[in-house]
Amino acid sequence: MDTLGRLLLLATLFLTPAEAQQASERRLKPWLVGLAAVVGFLFIVFILMLANRVWCAKGRAEDEEATFRMEHIMNENSQPSKADKKQKKKVDRKGGQSNEALELEEKESSDEERGKKTAL
């Protein structure tokens, strides 16, 4: 019976009817409410970004080691071989590579100029 009495006492304390507050005369302007909403939203996004950064963070030593490995591999691969150097010298001796698209445009423009210079 003691527990039943305690439950009834707690029920009457927590389930008492709520009284409405008096309406305050002071209300915020609409632009201030919007500004507060935007600031609140940006604050929530900031907190979520911090949580994401902490949650998904990796160890710095691992990142630096992987970067060092990649740079080392890239430096080894970036050194041109002797065959590549010889081929480049041959292309330079021949006068370089030609841009066929540019030559085609030059030919078309010369055809148009001929059409303009015809006498009537």
UniProtKB/Swiss-Prot annotation:
Where on the chain is Phosphoserine found, per UniProt?
S109, S110
Task: Please tell me where this protein is predominantly located.
Answer: membrane
Concerning InterPro entries, the annotation shows: PDZK1IP1/SMIM24 (IPR031627)
Its annotated compartments are: Membrane
The UniProt entry lists membrane topology as: Single-pass membrane protein
Which residue ranges does UniProt annotate as crossing the membrane? 31-51
Q: Where is this region: Disordered?
A: 71-120
Composition-biased stretches (Acidic residues): 102-111
Record flagged with keyword Magnesium: no
Q: Which UniProt keywords apply?
A: Membrane, Phosphoprotein, Signal, Transmembrane, Transmembrane helix
Q: Which domain of life is it from?
A: Eukaryota
**Range of residues in the leader sequence:** 1-20
Q: Which GO terms describe its cellular component?
A: membrane
Q: Which family does it belong to?
A: Belongs to the PDZK1-interacting protein 1/SMIM24 family.
Q: What is this protein called?
A: Small integral membrane protein 24
Q: What is the lineage of its organism?
A: Eukaryota, Metazoa, Chordata, Craniata, Vertebrata
Coding gene? Answer: Smim24
